[in-house]
Design a protein with these regions (language model features):
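Acidic, surface-exposed loops and disordered segments
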Residues: 1-295
């Protein structure tokens, strides 16, 4: 993360630090944060870092997709935090084809009143839940809220039935069933398999109507909005990227969710949850600073 912090637009230096802390709390990809948030006098620039900044041909498509999903999640955190600081985040995605590492430009514009939904999302950034909760189903109204959260970001949320999940797991290559840790960890094949028979666990797929770098960046924002909405409602959340890492299994998942949507991210949702005893330091700082900002 860029250490050169300065006022940006109508945001003070301290408010920009709050935004940067929230950005750093986004789920990483393969134990790395492939983005950098850069300050300019009028905007915050989200830029790709290695290996994402390398030529597309040098980075396998599945890896590039996962990295851009992570960048999209960071961008959603930036947008959500700017809103609770009283500004509107005007966003341009991939605005300059001559700067492929420039993923987004976010201009804070004064005069914005955050809604209760905005505040809940911003607070959820610091409330990543990984503790094992007791049994209890996820009600249909909650599933509908998560679907609406995905739609806000021009993405789609589908739920895999237990038999569909079992079929995908049987076809997932062993080499892709590894976990990667982090605040929203890939819990790996073992926990995915466990999800088949647990009534309080739902496996959901975030998808988009296109399959391009821009769609991956957009899908990362949809993924993060769903995760934060679930966290705010007390659900435990984690990522299962191995389920769509290999082309054959990704194609199978695409068929299962109707064939018209490209699966970009797979989420494991468990209900209900309690905040874990240990949180990432950056998330704890973000929560404290955000509470001060919205008082």
């Amino acid at each position: 993360m860029n250490s050169d912090v300065m006022p940006v637009g109508n945001l003070t230096r301290d408010q920009v630090r709050t935004v940067m802390t929230a950005c750093a709390a986004a789920p990483p990809a393969r134990n790395a944060r492939p983005w950098q948030l850069v300050c300019t006098p009028t905007a915050l620039e989200l830029r790709a870092v290695l290996p994402l900044a390398e030529k597309s041909a040098d980075v396998p498509a599945p890896d590039r997709r996962e990295l851009l999903l992570s960048c999209g999640a960071a961008l959603l955190n930036v947008r959500a935090t700017i809103k609770v600081l009283g500004a509107h985040p005007a966003v341009r995605l991939m605005p300059d084809e001559n700067q492929p590492d420039l993923l987004a430009v976010v201009q804070p514009q004064a005069g914005f009143a955050a809604t209760p939904v905005d505040v809940a999302l911003a607070e959820a950034i610091a409330q990543r839940r990984t503790a094992r909760p007791p049994a209890g189903g996820i009600p249909v109204p909650m599933i509908n809220r998560l679907r609406q959260a995905a739609r806000v970001e021009q993405t789609w949320l589908a739920i895999l039935a237990p038999d569909q999940l079992q079929d995908v797991l049987l076809r997932t290559p062993d080499g892709d069933a590894r976990g990667h840790g982090g605040p929203a960890a890939d819990v790996g094949a073992a926990n995915a398999q466990e999800s088949v028979d647990r009534s309080n666990v739902v496996v959901a797929v975030v998808g988009s109507f296109h399959d391009s770098p821009l769609a991956w960046l957009q899908s990362g924002q949809g993924m993060q909005r769903v995760l934060l909405t679930a966290d705010a409602a007390g659900l435990t959340t984690s990522l299962l990227p191995h389920m769509v890492r290999a082309t054959p299994t990704r194609g199978l998942v695409r068929t299962m969710i109707g064939g018209g949507v490209w699966p970009q991210a797979v989420l494991r949702l468990e209900s209900p949850a309690q905040p874990s005893a240990v949180r990432p330091t950056s998330a704890a700082v973000a929560r404290e600073e955000m509470h001060r900002s919205v008082r």
